[in-house]
Amino acid sequence: MGVFTYESEFTSEIPPPRLFKAFVLDADNLVPKIAPQAIKHSEILEGDGGPGTIKKITFGEGSQYGYVKHKIDSIDKENYSYSYTLIEGDALGDTLEKISYETKLVASPSGGSIIKSTSHYHTKGNVEIKEEHVKAGKEKASNLFKLIETYLKGHPDAYN
C-alpha cells in the first residue's frame, strides 16, 4: 500500500468560528440545502456526531458518485480543526483503500479564515494517484467553500 499526501489552502472572508459552525458542525444540514446537486443528504449510521461516528453521504444527481461513508477521527471546536476518513463508497474506486482528510481553519490577518487541508490517499498495492483526480477533488472542495461563503455573506445572522 502506498500513501500519497496532498496539501491545499483556501481563503475566506468569513471568520473561523462562523465558518467552522457552517462547514463542519452543521454541514449535514447546510450543504444539501445550498448544493442539492452535489449532496442529496447525509445520515449518521453509528455514533453521536463526535469522533468514531460513521456517516453516509448520498450524492446529488449532478455527481458522478452515488455515496461515501466516512468516519470522524477528530473534531476540535476550540482550535477549529476536523479530521475524517473516507472508508467506503464508489469515490474510492478500485485503487484506493481509504482517504484521510485533515482540515484546520486559522484566522487570517484580514479577519477572515485560511483553510488548510491535508489529504492522505491510501492506495491498494503500488497504484499511483493521478494528478487530475487530486485536482478535481481540490476544485470541488474549493467550490463548496465558495458556496458556503456566499451563503454566509447573504445570511449575516446565520451561524453566529
Swiss-Prot record:
GO biological process: abscisic acid-activated signaling pathway; defense response
SUPFAM superfamilies: Bet v1-like
Signal peptide: none
Membrane-crossing residue ranges in chain numbering: none
Cysteine pairings via disulfide bonds: none
Source taxon at top rank: Eukaryota
Gene3D superfamilies: 3.30.530.20
Record has Transferase as a keyword: no
Keywords: Allergen, Pathogenesis-related protein, Plant defense
Record GO terms (molecular function): abscisic acid binding; protein phosphatase inhibitor activity; signaling receptor activity
Record family assignment: Belongs to the BetVI family.
Annotated protein name in UniProt: Major allergen Pru av 1
Lineage: Eukaryota, Viridiplantae, Streptophyta, Embryophyta, Tracheophyta
Gene expressing this chain: PRUA1
